[in-house]
Amino acid sequence: MKKFNKITPEGTKDILFEECLSQRTVSERLTHIFKMRGYNEVITPGMEYYDVFDAPNAAIPQYEMYKSTDNKGRLIVFRPDLTLPIARLTATRLQAMEKPIRLYYNQPIYRNRKDLSGRSDETTQAGIELLGASGLKADIEVIAAAVEALSACTENFRLEIGSAKFFGALADELPVSADKKEDIRQTIESKNYAALGDMLDALPKSVYTEAIKKLPRLFGGAEVFAEAEQFCKGHPVLSETLDYMRTLYTALSSLGLDDRLMVDFGLVQRNDYYTGVVFSAYVENYGDAVLMGGRYDTLLKQFDAPMPAIGFAANVDALASVLLDDGRIESCLLYTSPS
C-alpha cells in the first residue's frame, strides 16, 4: 500500500487560488520595485554543490540542508540560501562588469526545518544585492528599497536596524574562543537572557561583559544611542560604529517611517557573514521576520573576488499571508456551469 501518495512532504504544502494570487501579487510588486531601482534579475540553479555553502562563516548548519549526489557522486544541496549562490555567480560570471553591480532575484529556498517549528521547508524569497559599493549611500539605497518593498504590501511593519560590527567589537574583547563567541551570539539571537547572563558571569567582569548583557535591552528610538555611548568610551571601533549608526538612523528617519523605525543593538543575525549594518522587518501579528538583510563585505573574498556588498531577502510567502489577512486580495475563484 502506498502510504504517502496523497500527502506532501513535511514542511511543504499545496497552494491554491487566493494564496496563489497573493504570492504572485507580492512577487510582481517587489520585482517591479527592484527593476525601477535599476536592479537586474538573475536566476541561480535550484541545486548547488555543497562546497558553495560550506564556507567557514556561511552559518547554515549542514543538517538544515537537503542533500543529494549527482551522477558522479559529488555532494549537492537544494539551495538553502540565495546570497551565497549570487556571490558565487558574481565572482565567476560578473567580475568584468562595472561596479557597483545591482542584482535581484525571486526564487525558492529549501531548509530542513526542525519538526513542529511551524516553518515551511520551501519558501520563496525576493531580494536584492548591491555588490561593489560601500558606505552610507549604499546602505541607505538598499534599506530604502526594503522600505518601499514592505510598503507595497503593508503599512503595519516595523523596521529594526542594528550592527554586526558593534557586537563583534564587544565580543573580541572577551577572553574566549571563536566558538564561545558564536555561542554567545546564538544565545542573544534566541533571546535566552538567563543563559546569556550565566555565560558572561563565568567570565572576568568587565565593561564589555556588562555591555553584552545589556545589548538585548538597547532597543528603541534615538535615545538608544545615548545609552550605548557608555560602553564606547576609549574604544575607537565601538565609537565609530555608534556614530555611523546614529547617522544612518537620522538619514532613514527622513523616509517617513516615524515610530516604525527602531534601533536594536541586540539584533545579531544568524548569518555570520554580516560585517556592518543589519536589519530586520516585522509585521503585526506575524511572529518571524518578513525581511532580513545586512552588509557582508568579506563574503566574496571566499570566492576569490573581494568586494563590499549589502542586500536583503523578503519572505514572499509571509508577505502574501499578510495581504490575505489584511483582505487586500479579492477572491479569484471561478465558477462554471456544468455542461
Positions of predicted regions on the chain:
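Extended alpha-helical scaffolds
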Residues: 153-156, 164-171, 180
